[in-house]
Each structure stands twice: as structure tokens, then as C-alpha cells.
Amino acid sequence: MELPWTALFLSTVLLGLSCQGSDWESDRNFISAAGPLTNDLVLNLNYPPGKQGSDVVSGNTDHLLCQQPLPSFLSQYFSSLRASQVTHYKVLLSWAQLLPTGSSKNPDQEAVQCYRQLLQSLKDAQLEPMVVLCHQTPPTSSAIQREGAFADLFADYATLAFQSFGDLVEIWFTFSDLEKVIMDLPHKDLKASALQTLSNAHRRAFEIYHRKFSSQGGKLSVVLKAEDIPELLPDPALAALVQGSVDFLSLDLSYECQSVATLPQKLSELQNLEPKVKVFIYTLKLEDCPATGTSPSSLLISLLEAINKDQIQTVGFDVNAFLSCTSNSEESPSCSLTDSLALQTEQQQETAVPSSPGSAYQRVWAAFANQSREERDAFLQDVFPEGFLWGISTGAFNVEGGWAEGGRGPSIWDHYGNLNAAEGQATAKVASDSYHKPASDVALLRGIRAQVYKFSISWSGLFPLGQKSTPNRQGVAYYNKLIDRLLDSHIEPMATLFHWDLPQALQEQGGWQNESVVEAFLDYAAFCFSTFGDRVKLWVTFHEPWVMSYAGYGTGQHAPAISDPGMASFKVAHLILKAHARTWHLYDLHHRLQQQGRVGIVLNSDLAEPLDRKSPQDLAAAERFLHFMLGWFAHPIFVDGDYPTTSAQIQHINQQCGHPLAQLPEFTEAEKRLLKGSADFLGLSHYTSRLISKAGRQTCTSSYDNIGGFSQHVDPEWPQTASPWIRVVPWGIRRLLRFASMEYTKGKLPIFLAGNGMPVGEEADLFDDSVRVNYFNWYINEVLKAVKEDLVDVRSYIVRSLIDGYEGPLGFSQRFGLYHVNFNDSSRPRTPRKSAYLFTSIIEKNGFSAKKVKRNPLPVRADFTSRARVTDSLPSEVPSKAKISVEKFSKQPRFERDLFYDGRFRDDFLWGVSSSPYQIEGGWNADGKGPSIWDNFTHTPGNGVKDNATGDVACDSYHQLDADLNILRTLKVKSYRFSISWSRIFPTGRNSTINKQGVDYYNRLIDSLVDNNIFPMVTLFHWDLPQALQDIGGWENPSLIELFDSYADYCFKTFGDRVKFWMTFNEPWCHVVLGYSSGIFPPSVQEPGWLPYKVSHIVIKAHARVYHTYDEKYRSEQKGVISLSLNTHWAEPKDPGLQRDVEAADRMLQFTMGWFAHPIFKNGDYPDVMKWTVGNRSELQHLASSRLPTFTEEEKNYVRGTADVFCHNTYTSVFVQHSTPRLNPPSYDDDMELKLIEMNSSTGVMHQDVPWGTRRLLNWIKEEYGNIPIYITENGQGLENPTLDDTERIFYHKTYINEALKAYKLDGVDLRGYSAWTLMDDFEWLLGYTMRFGLYYVDFNHVSRPRTARASARYYPDLIANNGMPLAREDEFLYGEFPKGFIWSAASASYQVEGAWRADGKGLSIWDTFSHTPLRIGNDDNGDVACDSYHKIAEDVVALQNLGVSHYRFSIAWSRILPDGTTKFINEAGLSYYVRFIDALLAAGITPQVTIYHWDLPQALQDVGGWENETIVQRFKEYADVLFQRLGDRVKFWITLNEPFVIAAQGYGTGVSAPGISFRPGTAPYIAGHNLIKAHAEAWHLYNDVYRARQGGTISITISSDWGEPRDPTNREHVEAARSYVQFMGGWFAHPIFKNGDYPEVMKTRIRDRSLGAGLNKSRLPEFTESEKSRIKGTFDFFGFNHNTTVLAYNLDYPAAFSSFDADRGVASIADSSWPVSGSFWLKVTPFGFRRILNWLKEEYNNPPIYVTENGVSRRGEPELNDTDRIYYLRSYINEALKAVHDKVDLRGYTVWSIMDNFEWATGFAERFGVHFVNRSDPSLPRIPRASAKFYATIVRCNGFPDPAQGPHPCLQQPEDAAPTASPVQSEVPFLGLMLGIAEAQTALYVLFALLLLGACSLAFLTYNTGRRSKQGNAQPSQHQLSPISSF
């Protein structure tokens, strides 16, 4: 049944047939049409006898592109057609061939002339051409992407065709296959939209033809499928409303010979069309016509008679089905009517086997039984049909892992693993961990160039219990991400609903033996169709159900391990079949119309052949085997709805045994009807073959073979594999395909070959799977034979498997993957095997052709319209004006300098990677390559290269082009910058010796890059001079200018038609200085005073010479650009305020980059500072002239302007300081007169990580040389022997590229591209292989040099896909208000602010003791006075009023109330302070939030053990009781403990906090924590039981936690580490209180395991009794939560002997270097983590009411009132809290930490958290509001962030009494690089951060106006307004 979307086309285009359709001349001869020409037809007609596959008229492969000269036999062929009464011939034009550019302005004239010649040949043979404008594939063009563009382009193309061929053509068709054209349109998923597009295009062509070309007297139509017409008979009234758009109706007609209706009757039915219309049968397909049936001639005669007799308005039809064309060496090709009717399918004709036996199996056996081995194994050199799909498969349980992730339920395979049933006790719990790696797996597919990916969906991953319920969101998200990634990479998803992994919950109800599972499966399938069907168009209901039935329920080898072959296996299969049929009908009825997909089933089968080829019994047994294996499922679906008749064997054996040995269920008649035809395709998987004999002595055992009555064997000559059941029998797949086609699909349905492969064993070579390479070659070639020679309609070939996985009972011992997976590494790295490259090659060739199939990829284009233009001929000033870069940025605060910027680069930005020949190619002496200076150098002893390494092999890229291309595709790079080895193509350096093999290598590389849509950027010289040229002096010899030009000229001529970006030299500074000054690089010359200048002089002139050669000889034709790559570090003045350092920094830049750039980009001469300095020093050295050579005026003019773009390589930055070096001996280094100082010291890295230097360097280049196009051609970080998790490199690229983005977006630098150094690990010069720069790890110890992706290789493609670093949707700013009644608060703590440490009877606390202990507190600070809040109640209340908060959270000093910690004595003076303070708060309308304990334990209690002494629980309860009694009438918000984690872990673990205990880190923290929890619970119960009723307050605890993100989200261990981090920090105390009264399981498990592992007899973590658990559980009224930052967590295994909290947690943490820093080393600004951890609290603890009781950020250094960093922090974090509210988190309040600067524990007063500055230089300690205080006050007044689009909000107006804050320190503050007065800075601050506007007189007014301009629809603004020099 054709898809119903054709209704739209019919109704919108063809209902109103034009009146011209009825004017067809009555005397016009009847049309009998043949054609068109196809590649197969031409091949068959041109083949000598014996080479033809069959007599083919219109083959099944690509239509023939017109190429001159036309085949010589065409004239004879056309004449024979005319002699056979053929009158017309179909010709298919190629749109893409005629208009290669897409525009009729530039047609391919050769193609036009070719088609005219073809049409004229037809006319000469008296055949009338019938021309189709668009047969299948429209040309790929970016223009088609635009809405409405297709119709315009098609009209343009049609006009050209009418003009060019109209004099030769009278009959035109716009489209002949609508469905295939739609599939090739950009928006094919929207079928209705695509059909409307074609309708518009057709109408345009029709109108143009009849308006402009009516004089030609022709007709125009479009081809439709005939079976749609009866269902779509139009209403006459509707027809009148539609204008005509065809002259006659053209149909694609299929007819079944065995149909009840005759063909004439079928034609007569078409006459019911209204209005009456002439009908032409464009294609006549005769199906299911047996060779012994009606003769073709009689059928043809009956057709003609019916037409004449019944006056059927049929003007003609296709006669291909009645023609037979032959050719031999002696006669010309000829065609005639045939007497043996061909069986024509939708795409091809299949020749029936003559005189074949009755059954399909016997006919197949007869066709191949007598083949000789030579004939059977002959290799077919041919290609698959166009559109053939190449794919790869996996199964969910094989690869996903993630067994306990995000709510996923267990499957039967999880249960199977728990039984330790698999080899090596392997389980599927982690498998290949694909659950965490969807992007990585898709990248692998992209690398192979797969077109389809067959994967399965985990049923229990979506529905944990199998039944319809709330789906698992994380599971849905995983598959959405996978599918979206596939489509982004142009890979078609083929989703399997069931691949053996039934939810265990359903298995416990009987599994597939329980009828209810069918309903459950239907619900699951319906959800998948609804959720994913908008993108998935190929569905598989069941994958290999035979395996599930046989091995799962028959032999019990597979899960669920049930052994019942006679009963269970048949019952399971029965229910699977019913589930499949109902699922297909579900899709057909409810989803097909909208989604336009296809649903099938994948069945597996071996091929069976008789053991005794002459035995009829064995032949019958073999046929029975096939029906038992394949027919068991295929026959009901594809034949008649019931099991095959061979199932009678079951009845037979039951009768023989006298009891039911097996029971085959029966289908009802309704079920049979449901089953029959319930598939859109047959999926087939096949691995091996079997020899079958009749069963020997039958027994009454219920084995599979015994029930089937056969016995299985293998030929011992068949090669073995690692699997005992797979033998290599390639020809079996061809025979099986032919059988399946004849028995089941019969040409009506396509076959998708959905599984084929073989495993290698663990003991085999990990990467060289040559045996599998052979397997694929043989098997795929047999599939090709089935398609080409047997004409089986196979649409795909899908390899098993993409990666190694869990193979059920065999565990991980058998490896099917094209990619090897290292299961011993937690990150499960994937490395390509040899077979991956082979499969790619087959895909690229679409089979086994000598040439790759041209895919016409969209070319990556770089914009070269704006090239560098030198307009200023003046030399640079000294120092240059580019020093503005220093002035512009030197005063930036660190926070502003490093703040991450969100944005994208220009659309055509070139993202690439770089390499160089000596470093990667190897093949140092291969195929005639000559030696280079690096070959000579590395083979010379004592060369200084680490480990005596050489580049002889390196990465072996010379021999592994496929491997390099694989990883380039995987990375999605748009460009590849590589270098040509001079000595590889000119072994002696001269063009008299050209090495063809070397040239061929680069041609293959360049061609492959272009074919893969990767832009080649080619460097001519990357330090590897041919040794033969060095022998004549190398670059000291001026003759190299001419020789280099000769080499370059050859490269331009040979490669320039494809290479459009050239660089002459890479980093000439390195080659010159390291090769001729220090001499550490070849040619190892040490003459530092003269030779660097002499050599550079020649290099510059050589560059200029080559530039002019390209410019004069090649540019006009090749249209490329040419430049050179320069390098330098950024030079930052050590003291930007010291002019000498500024000049020294500029001098360094001029002596490095300017040395070469100044002559080329400036004035043709060296920088004046170089000439001045070297000249003066030469004179001081008593030399007659400067050591720096001079250019003549002619040379200056020749050199000046010899670069089109600016390419530079950069890695790091250095501090530069002026220095006066020695004069002698003369040296280039000393000439610079400076000293370099490293910015920081890092170990294990090649370069210091100084990303901000990139932005400054780019700005310097812009200022120095003008704003010319710039390409960063190298940038990367080298690491010493890094792991695959190279997080440091990710941070490096992330921050460096972000600085480049700032330069582009904020500073206007014309940056066009970025190339990462380097693609893969390589030979790193003197460091050999010890320093690794590669995005890919290369194993240099393995002969094949396998490449494995590092984490950075996963990060970089995402950068490319996003074209930069756009703001993530979740990070977009959210405008809105918090809920009414939301609490805004500020916080402090007693010891941190009160002071008065011995006043009025206060007792000592542990912090008094700790701070008076030497070396405990930074700067020897203490809290004796602190902020003196004890004496400043009024001042503190005023500070709170400044903020406008409704609440204030403070703590009570235990020792101020109870000096010795007990109730023996209550200090009334201390209590009075709190009463007075609380009263003052209440009087000011501020509600107190009181923390009972904030770390300051009375020292008297610590003296008896503190929190390690269990008696403290009662002491704390008594202390709390005093507070409840005395203050409870005023205080309604109580917090028992603040951050117990810090108390326990830092006070009793690390000892960095009071009481400073660190010598029992494995026990003390847990004991203290245990008592803290019990103390909290007792205090809560006290309040709940005694005080709550009369006081009406609430009480809970404040728990602190960072958020933990996995360092590598794709690494399962890192994911688990992040969870452990949060559970050990926040869950330690939250889990007992808010969950179940006990510690988190991960804590209990890890601490117990480590305790026992250390020899202890129990866990170091104390246990709660059951009564304690009950008493602790639920002791909360709300969740008090403190949060400041986020970490990146990863697993770290400590030795068992280590006993500590950190060792137990087993987690290490780092920070992303792009995260803004604060004044605290541990606190990085990470707003996103705030929302995530709030959501975690919601999910983990059932969404309790949450109050954020602390959140803030610190600063260090000189105090400033303009705390822009804190405003950024508060704005970002509070906005994330607002988002959490929108996530339904029950957030009730927010508290800023802190109200004022205070004593910050061990750091003293160095870290300032306060929104009020406390001026400690003033004895009165005034509280001065910072800008952040006023910002926070605005948020409080507004209760959030008013939407500017809603107009000005009153809350944004400053209160009238708000006075500007005067600074106690300075009158001006720096703001974004400017010095502003406090008032101006404050205004600018509010403008920038609070309201995102530039310049403000009225804050609210401008907010309103900017909001109106920027708001688009309902979208939230996603980017701040940015200062040109700010990253804010």
C-alpha cells in the first residue's frame, strides 16, 4: 500500500486536468515506450557472452549519466527497438550534471551537448524522446534549504531544459518518482511540506512551458503511482476549483499476474477518473508471474485488443516487461519481444530459474548446487545500487551499561549476570558504558561514514517495571540525545524495540510465556513511536526472536535461562509473533500517516545445505531446518499468517513418541489475518552456514534438532572463528538472500541485511583483525552478487557490531566490534580496528569499485574576499602603537579578565587540527623518499632527542591514511592543516627528481579530505629540509630561494586545483633560532650573532618569491590564498607601569613575530627597534656594520604585502623585564635586551597555561598590522604521558579559544579560523614521544600505531558543532519574581562578628583557644574584637536595613550563655545581649533566624572530649533548652547546628578548624558526626515536645554541600565519584535526618569495606540502633542549606592503609580553569551547580521546604567598594535559585553570606565575604555598604528580577534616603579598565549588572527601553551587553 501522503500531491496538483489533455490528436500513433538507459543495461549490452548476469532491459542500478563519446552500439540498439515496434524512449536528465553550480547561468555545456547528441540519436532511429527532468535526486545545494527556493531552482532548471532540448522533445515529465525525490529533499521528514514543495515546482514548470514554449507543441505530465488513484477519486466540484497542471496522466502501474482482475480490467478501472483524461502507463511492473504462466505475447495482444475494443483512453504504456535485449561479440545489441516473461519488481527484473523444482529452497539449491569452486568464489568487481544503506549495529544490553542509572529497572540480563552465569562472571552492568557516551559512539559512526545505525532501546530503561507507567526521564533523555546526535551527523537511526532484554519484573510474571506481556509490549511500543517516531523512520519490532525463543527458553543458554525446548520455546515464539503483528498494525493505524516510517522485523538464519548433496532426505532435512529457523517467524508474517507446513514434523514426532514432545500453538483465523503482511521489510541477519542431514536414530528427547528431524554439521574445511558456532562460509549469505526473496518477499518488499559479522578472541591482536577484514570482503561481495546477479532487492548491509560488548554467556571473551573496547579501563576507550577502515573503504566505494563514489559533499568554503592589504608603509614606532594592547588590558581585575564569555564565531569559521610530516608520517625511506635534515639529525648519536627517538615510523601516517581520515571525520573538523615533506616528493630537493609515490600519497590525502568535506590547509616547509640541500649550505645558501620556488611551483601546479590555502613556512623563527643560533635543532649550527639574521633574510626572500609565483601564475585560476605561519608568546610587561618593561615586552614581540611580519605585513623592512638595537650593539661590539642584513629598496617593495592572511601559532605567555645583557659574544638572544620570567610553574605540561595572553596578542596583531584576516594555525598543550582523560588539555583549549572569542566578538579582531595542535600524539622534536599534544592517543609500542580518542577529542567536536561557546539554554537569564512571602535574609556567626571574647563573663570557646595558638590562623588574626558586634547592635541593624531584608540569621555563642558549657551557671549579661539584639531586630521589622551552634564550642566541653564525648548530646540539649526558655517567645526560626560536616571533617579530621584534631582522621570525624546528629535530634524533639505548641516556631538543621560534577561525564567512575562526593558531604548528615535515620549506603559500604580491608573487625563508621534511627528520622521542619561552589569529581583510590575521611570517600576534586576564582582557593564561581544541587535535594529528600541559609563569595587584596565580582556572583546564583523554583523546588528563602566582612576562620580577615566593608583601619569599625549591598537590596525590593519587557518597575527606583557610599580608602575605583569616581562606578555597576544597559540617567527608563528592543517573543535574553574591553 502506497503511503497516503500522495493524496496531497494529487489533490493540489492533478485534480483539475487541463483542457489541453483532451486535445491529444486522435490520429496520433499509440505510444510504446522503452528505456531509460541504466549503467547495468549498458554493461549487459556491451558484455561478451558468458559475462552477462541475465537478459536485462531496465536494470536496477543508477541511471546512466550522459558522457561523451556515447557508446558505439547505441544506434544499433535504438534501431532494434524501433524494429520491435517501440515508438518512444525515456531519457532521464541529470539536474546536477547539467547545472553543477545550481544556476542556469553556468550550465555544463559539455553535458548539454551530450544530451542533445543522445536525443538526436533517438530521433535518427525514429524514436521519440520522452524526457524526465528530475528522476530521483535533486542536486545538493544550500540554496534548497531556504523555504520556497526549490520551486525557483526547479523552474530555472526546467527553463534551461526547454530551451536546450525543446526542438528535439515533445513529451516531458517533471518528476518520475516522487517518493525518492522527497527522500532526497532537505526536509524529507515533513512529507506534507515536501510534497507541497514538489507540487509548486511542477506547477511552475507547467506554466513556463505553456507560456514560453507552447510553439514547440509538446505535452507535459508527472508520474503517479496507479494504486493511489481509486482511493483518491476527486469530487467534480473540487476539480473545478483547481487549475490544470498536466496534459495527460502518467502512471506507475503494478500488476500481479495471478490477480483475479486481468490487466485490461485494471486499465479500465482508470477510466473512472473525472474529468476524463488520457492515461499513459509510464512504468508497467508485472509481479509474481511464473515462467510457465500466460505468455507475454498473448498478454500484450489482449492489452492492445482491450484498448481498441473498449476505447480505453490509454495513449500508451511501458513495454520493457515484454522486451529481451541481448548482445554478443559477433552481433550488435538487439531487442525483441520475449516469450519468457521477466519477473519485474519495483526496481529490477529477476529472471526465473528455468525448469526449477517446486519449492523456493529447491530452486535455489538447483541454481547453485553444481557451481564449481572457482565460479562460486569468483570475486565480483562492481558497486551496489545508488541509495544502498551501509550501517552498523549494537544491542542495548550488549553495550549500554548504566544498569542502575536514573531509575532504570533491571532486565533479565542483569538478573542473569547476578547468577554469575557468564564466562569470567562478566555482567552487563557497565558493558561498554554507551549510556554515558552517546556522543562518542556517534562520533565513531561518523568516522566510519556509516549511513544507518541500528540500535535497540532498553525496555526497562524506559519503563523500569515493564508496565506502562511514568517513563524514566533519564532513559528517554539518553535516547533523545542519541537520536538527535545521529541525525546531526546525517546517520539514519534504525531503532529496535526488543533485543532480548525483557524487564525482569515482567519475567517474574512469566515473561514471554504470559499473554499479558503482549499488552505490555504494545504499550511500550506505542510510547516509543510517539516519543521518537518524529525522527526514527526505520523500526524493528524484534531482533532475532529465534535466539530468544531457542536459547532463552529452549536450551537455557541465554537469559532468562529456561530450558524447555518442546513447550516454552514455541509458546514464546507464538506470543512474540502476535506482539509483532499488533505493533505493526498499531504503527500502521496511528503513526504511519504522520511519521512516514517503516516497521519490520529482523530474523536470523544460517543457510542450510544437504550434507549428502545427492540425498533427497538430506535435501528435505535442510529445507526443513530453514523453515524451522527462518520460516518459524517469516512464514506467518510474509506468507500466509500461519506456521510453515514443515511444522507437521512436530505432529509426526509427537505421534511417534506417543506423548507431546513439543507443542506448537495455533493461530486463530483472525490472528492469521493480523499476521499476514505485517511488515514493511524483512530484516535478515546471517553469520554462518550449516550442513544438514536427516536425523539419525530419533529419540523422544525434546531437543531442537530432534523435534525438527535433522542433524547439524559443518565442513571441516570451513575456516573457524573465535566463536565455535560461526564458520566462515561466505557464499551462504547469497543463497540465503535468494531463498528469502523467492520464499518471503517475492520482490514486493525489500530486504534489509541487518546483522553480519564475526568475533575475534581476547587473545588475538587487539587492533589487527585481518581475519575479519577477509570475512567482510567475502561476505559483502556475496551480498553484491545477490543484488547484481540474482537481482535480490537488498537495501542495506549492517555490520555487527560498532564496538565490543557484553556477549551474554560468553561475557567479554568474544569481540565483534569494529572498535576495540578496553574493558579494564573505567572510561571504556574505543580504538578502531583494521576492519573499521576496510568497512569505510567499502562504504566510500559503495562496493568494490576501483574508485570512490562521488558524494558531491557541500564544500567547506572560506571567505577570501578580504585579503591583507598593506596601506601603511611606515615602520612601527618604538615601542609600537600596538602597546595600546597593554594599556587597554593591564589594569583589568583578574575576575574581569578571566570571566568566561558566551558567543559564537562567524558562520564560515574554519575549525581544524594541525600536523607536520616528520612528526607523523613515518615512512622515512619508503617508496623513494629522500632523507631530510631531521632524518639525519635523529640518526646522529648525541642529538639530544629523548630516548634516542626518531621519526622513522612516528604515527605511520604515510601508510595509515585511512586511520587519519577516520579520526578527522570523527572530530567533525572543517579543515586540516598539514605539511608536505619536500624530500618525499623531491628526494634531492630538486624538481629533476620527482617521487611519484610521494606525490600520489599527497594526492590521495587531499582528494580524501575534499571528499570528506574537509578543507586542506597546506604548509610547504615545516623544518624538514632535504638533506641534499643542506649539504650545499641549506638556508645559508641564497640558491635555496630558487629551489624553494621550484618546489612550491610544482605543489601549486599539482595540488592547487584542490588546495586553496597555502603557507610557505611554519614558524620560521623556530627554524632560524633553534637551528642556527642555539643549534639544538638541525642543522645544528651555533652562530647566534650572525646566522639567525642571515638565514631569516633568505627565508623572507624565499617566501616573497613563492608568493609572487602563486600570485602571478595560479591565483586567477585557483583562487586561493597564501601566507606563512608565524609564532610568538605573548609578552606581558612585568610592571605595566614601568616604561622600560613596556618597551622590553614590545621589543620581544618585534624580535620574534615582527622579525618576519614587519617586512611582509608592514613596509618590506625589519622593525626599527630591531635595526636600532642590533645596529647599536654591533657598533658597541666594534663591528663595521650591523649584523642585521639590509633589504634594498627593490627588495622591500618585493617583500612588502606578500601575504593574504595572517597565520600565527601561539601557546603561552611570559613576563618580560628590561635587562642589560653582555655584549660579547654577539647573540640574537642578548640583542633583545630583556629577561623572560615564567608566569607560573606547572609540572608535567609543555607550556604555562596563560589563556588571557591570546586575546592580548590578537589585539596586538590587529593594532600592529591592521585588522587583517587572522587564522590561529597552532594552539595546544603538551602533557607528559597523559591518560586518555586529558582534562587539563580540555581546560586549555576551552580557555584559550574563549579568549580568542573575546578578541573576535568584543575587540573586533577579524579572526577566521582555529587549528588545534595536534590531531594525535606525534614525534615532538627533542622531546621525542615523552610529550603528548594529541587529541588522540597513539600507542607507539604497537606496530599499527592505533589511535584512541582522549577526552579532548570528545570536547573539540562539540566546540565545532556549536561554532564556539554559545550560552547554554539552561544558563540563559530568567526574569521573574520569587513566590510571595519569599524570605530574604543575611547571615553572620557569633565568633566571626561579635568580638568581646572575654567581656561580661563570657567563657572561652574552642575558637578562642585555636586562634591564640601559633600557626593556626593566617596573619595571626583572631576574633577577639572581630566586627565588635557585641557593642554595635545599632550599627548592625542599620546595615540590615540598608539591605531591606526581612530576616537575619545569626548564631548564639554557647560560651557566652553558659561559660563552661553546662547549665551550672547562666551568664545573664551574655543572655541580655541577645535579648537586646533580638528586640532591636524585631523593632526594625526584621525576623531573627537563630543558629544554636555555629562551631564555637565552649573550651570546657572540649577539654572533656568535645563532640567525641557522647555526653555532649545531653549538654547540647540542655543548652538548647535554656535558649528555648529564654528566647523562644521572640525567636520563631531555630537552626540547631550549622554545617556539621565542617565541624566533623575539618575540626576532627584535617584539623584546619577548631579544635584542630587531626591525628585520628579515620575515626574521630565519624564519632563527632555521630554525636552531632544525635544532639540535633534531641534538640528537635525537645522543641517539638515541649515548646512548639506554645511558641509556634520551627526548628531544623543547616547542612552544607558543594555540588559535584563528574570530571568526565562519559566516565562511569567519575559519575559515581561525583555522587559519592555529594553523599559524603551533604548526605552524611541529611540522609539520617531527611531520609531513613541512617547514613547513606555508599558511606556505609565504602567505610565498612575499607575498614575490613585494613584488618579491622568492624566498620569505623558508628552504627545507629534501630531506636536511634527512628528518633533521628524526620527531625526537621525545613532543610537549611548552605552552598557556595561546585567541584569536578573523579575517583581516587587510596591505599588500604590510609585511614581517613578522604580515603574513605575515594574522590579527588578539581576546578574547571574557566570558572571565575574568588578570594578563597576552594570557592569557584559556578552558578549552574546551585540549581542542580537544589534539584538534587528535591529528588533525594522528597522536596522538603528549603531555606538557603548561606550563599556568598569572597574577595582578597585591597578593599574595594565596587565589588563587581560579588554582584556577578549574587546575580547569577540567585537567578539559578529562581530557576530552581520554576523546577518546582520548594525554596522558601535566601540568605546572603555575609552581612559584613568578618573573621573568616583560619584565613583570618584576608577573605572578605561581606556586602558591607568593615574598615579595620578605623577603630570604630564602620560598616560601609558596597555596591553589592545596594544590588542585593534591589533584588530584595523586587523579590527577584522584574522583566524589562513589562516596563519600568517601581522596585528599581533607589530609595530617596539612599546616599552614595563614600570610600574610606580611595576616591576612585577601577571599573572595566577605567578609573571612575565611586558614584560613577556605582551607576555603571547597576547599569551593567542589574539592568544590562549601557549608560543610564534613569535606571528604570532605560531598562524598559532596552527590554523592549531585545525581547523576542517569549524567549529569555541569553547574553549580557558587553563592554568592548570587558568579558562581563
From Swiss-Prot:
Expression (tissue specificity): Intestine.
Residues at the catalytic site: E1067, E1274, E1539, E1750
Catalytic activity: lactose + H2O = beta-D-galactose + D-glucose; phlorizin + H2O = phloretin + beta-D-glucose; D-cellobiose + H2O = beta-D-glucose + D-glucose; quercetin 4'-O-beta-D-glucoside + H2O = quercetin + beta-D-glucose
Residues annotated as signal peptide: 1-21
PTM description: N-glycosylated.
Region of interest called Glycosyl hydrolase-1 3, as start-end residue ranges on this chain: 904-1367
Propeptide stretches in the record: 22-867
Membrane topology note: Single-pass type I membrane protein
Record bears the keyword Transmembrane: yes
Region Glycosyl hydrolase-1 2, residue ranges: 364-856
Transmembrane segments: 1884-1902
Membrane topology, Extracellular segments: 22-1883
Similarity comment: Belongs to the glycosyl hydrolase 1 family.
Name listed for the protein in its UniProt record: Lactase/phlorizin hydrolase
Originating species: Rattus norvegicus
Gene this protein is translated from: Lct
